Amino acid sequence: MSGHAGAVSDLVDQLSKLPGIGRKSAERLAFHLLRVHEDEALALASAIRRVRTDVRYCSVCYNLSETELCRICSDPKRDATRLCVVEQPRDLLSLDASGVYSGLYHVLLGRIAPLDGITPDQLTIDSLVERVRTGNFSEIIMATNPTVEGDGTSLYLSNLMQEFPVEITRLARGITSGSVLEYANREIIADALTGRQRL
């Protein structure tokens, strides 16, 4: 039971549902929003509404985009012979920020995790297979996170790709096992990309 006014209590409840935000942090954020100028609070509300209404998945790679094709898929300067497979759009951002890779991406929107009830049919694997079948790729880079589920997903995908005349590689192990790509720094990601190994 909260001692806050109804609107404040509702805001704290909603903020505490965000990843990494506990009740105390949610209270601090709520009270901060009460102190800021009204325009600032309304700008935040507008940005949240806009991201929910305007942002969608790219129709080709499943990156986040405000248009049908994301900025990467619509960039003619990208290397269309290499395809890097990642779990989430935030992984794509981390890899692309390294500046080492200039190819295309495919976002799975998750990883195979049977214990969590996540199966291959819940990911964008069918779309990936179709892209490889119809594309002109010479290399597929498995850039799933170095976790049990990420490694399992990479193995599953590499088995699916055996029928295609492409080289299948995996990021080098400069990224610690069990870690997440979005938290790795640019240098580690660059080393993992340049030192990738054949699967």
UniProtKB/Swiss-Prot annotation:
Q: Which Gene3D superfamilies match?
A: 3.30.60.80, 3.40.1360.10, RecR Domain 1 (1.10.8.420)
Pfam families given in the database record: RecR_HhH, RecR_ZnF, Toprim_4
- Family statement: Belongs to the RecR family.
Against PANTHER family, the record matches this protein to: RECOMBINATION PROTEIN RECR
Q: Which organism is it from?
A: Rhodopirellula baltica (strain DSM 10527 / NCIMB 13988 / SH1)
What gene name is given for the protein in this entry?
recR
- The Toprim domain extends over 81-176
One Gene Ontology term from the biological process aspect of the record: recombinational repair
Q: What is the superkingdom listed in this entry's lineage? A: Bacteria
Q: What is this protein called?
A: Recombination protein RecR
Instruction: Cite the residue ranges of zinc fingers (C4-type).
Output: 58-73
CDD domains associated with the record: TOPRIM_recR (cd01025)
Q: What is the lineage of its organism?
A: Bacteria, Pseudomonadati, Planctomycetota, Planctomycetia, Pirellulales
State the protein's purpose: May play a role in DNA repair. It seems to be involved in an RecBC-independent recombinational process of DNA repair. It may act with RecF and RecO.
Entry-linked InterPro entries: DNA_Rcmb_RecR, Rcmb_RecR, Rcmb_RecR_Znf, TOPRIM_dom, TOPRIM_RecR
Q: Name one GO molecular function term.
A: zinc ion binding
Q: Keywords in UniProt for this one?
A: DNA damage, DNA recombination, DNA repair, Metal-binding, Zinc, Zinc-finger
Q: Which NCBIfam families match?
A: recR
